[in-house]
């Protein structure tokens, strides 16, 4: 099957610092979706975070496209995709990823999600386990309620006019001055100022700002993150999973990485000690090496409707427990259909732990 987008509109212009690959467009359910497609081989789906776009992967796409098909979409309401009044829930985004892949003729993928995109990745694996081979979570949401206070405030009713003011040209100029100071003071938030300000720059457009608020309020309220994966981690078994986190993440605390790893027997954890919320931007070469090692040393998960049913019936009381050294073949999940996220994974690679032992942690020396 040839994707309709491959025969459709292609925008070959790209500003400095963005991906050198053309942005392609395809219409799904009446809305234009922007995406980047590069390379040939097993498919890798890269999902960005809230307020961001496929350009967050710009440095990685050329590296990952050597021997793989890389698909990096702009989520609905983000980047160059349409920004309608619509469903901006985690589940809605997961369905959007399924539909985009269907149009492009791609059946199965390894999915990599950053921040909000991690929640979408988990939801995709939960809703469509037959289409997911592996899951990679990068500074993902959906673990505990903790999140940066500014995001909690932005989720409150009445925050729209304030956000509109913050995205005016004069205030953005002040923001750049403040962020330079944050960087100079070596604060955790200062490590990500360029990426955070890039996100803020995009919100000066009314439709982008409205989509940002709808997306945020679908998963965050005044108390923090309103959805969690931890009560459904048992639903994933046999899905190779990798967790990557920045050691100085000021948006979602690094402690969430270890909480998530403990809930996912067999998963790998990589801590980028000097990175903030965007480890894939801070050190793209190391990120590529970690991801390539994970991909080459794990087998794609296989789907079994019977195993899936047994996991659901077990309610987590009887997880798949094979002797150490054996290879788990059951199917794994991610977020819950009601918008909650869930994830647990057991991979069969050296360095991972099996049989209920604590997973291995890898970080910078």
Residue map of PLM features:
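Alpha/beta-hydrolase fold catalytic core
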Residues: 1-43, 66-68, 106-107, 193-194, ...
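Active-site loop/oxyanion-hole signature of alpha/beta-hydrolase fold enzymes
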Residues: 29-31, 36-38, 72-116, 148, ...
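Conserved HGGG/HGGXW glycine-rich cap/lid loop of the alpha/beta-hydrolase fold
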Residues: 31-80
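Acidic beta-to-alpha connecting loop that harbors the catalytic carboxylate
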Residues: 40, 247-249, 274-276
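Flexible "cap/lid" loop of the alpha/beta hydrolase fold
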Residues: 126, 134-168
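Conserved serine/cysteine hydrolase catalytic core
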Residues: 205-259, 271
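Catalytic histidine neighborhood in serine/cysteine hydrolases
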Residues: 261-277
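Catalytic histidine-centered segment of alpha/beta-hydrolase-like enzymes
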Residues: 272-288
């Amino acid at each position: 099957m040839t994707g309709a987008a491959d025969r459709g509109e292609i925008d070959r212009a790209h500003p400095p610092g963005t991906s050198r690959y053309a942005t392609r467009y395809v219409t799904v359910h009446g809305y234009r979706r922007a995406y980047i497609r590069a390379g040939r081989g097993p498919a890798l789906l890269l999902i960005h975070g809230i307020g961001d776009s496929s350009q967050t992967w710009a440095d990685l796409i050329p590296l990952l496209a050597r021997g793989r098909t890389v698909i990096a979409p702009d989520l609905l309401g983000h980047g160059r995709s349409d920004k309608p009044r619509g469903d901006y829930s985690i589940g809605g985004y997961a369905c959007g990823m399924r539909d985009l892949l269907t149009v492009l003729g791609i059946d199965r993928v390894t999915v990599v999600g950053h921040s909000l995109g991690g929640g979408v990745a988990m939801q995709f694996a939960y809703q469509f386990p037959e289409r997911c081979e592996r899951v990679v979570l990068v500074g993902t949401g959906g673990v505990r309620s903790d999140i940066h206070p500014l995001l909690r405030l932005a989720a409150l009713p009445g925050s729209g006019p304030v956000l509109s003011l913050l995205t005016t040209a004069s205030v953005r100029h002040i923001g750049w001055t403040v962020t330079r100071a944050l960087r100079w003071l070596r604060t955790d938030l200062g490590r990500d100022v360029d990426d955070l300000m890039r996100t803020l720059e995009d919100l000066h457009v009314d439709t982008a700002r409205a989509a940002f608020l709808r997306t945020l309020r679908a998963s965050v309220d005044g108390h923090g993150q309103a959805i969690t994966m931890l009560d459904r981690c048992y639903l994933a078994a046999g899905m190779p999973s990798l967790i990557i986190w920045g050691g100085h993440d000021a948006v979602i605390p690094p402690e969430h990485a270890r909480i998530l790893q403990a809930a996912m027997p067999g998963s790998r954890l990589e801590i980028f000690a000097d990175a903030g919320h965007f480890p894939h931007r801070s050190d793209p070469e190391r990120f590529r090496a970690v991801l390539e090692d994970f991909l080459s040393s794990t087998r794609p998960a296989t789907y079994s409707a019977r195993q899936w049913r047994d996991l659901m019936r077990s309610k987590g009381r009887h997880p798949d427990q094979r002797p150490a050294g054996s290879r788990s073949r059951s199917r794994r999940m991610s977020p819950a259909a009601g918008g909650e996220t869930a994830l647990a994974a057991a991979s069969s690679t050296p360095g991972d732990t099996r049989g209920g032992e604590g997973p291995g942690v890898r970080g910078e020396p």
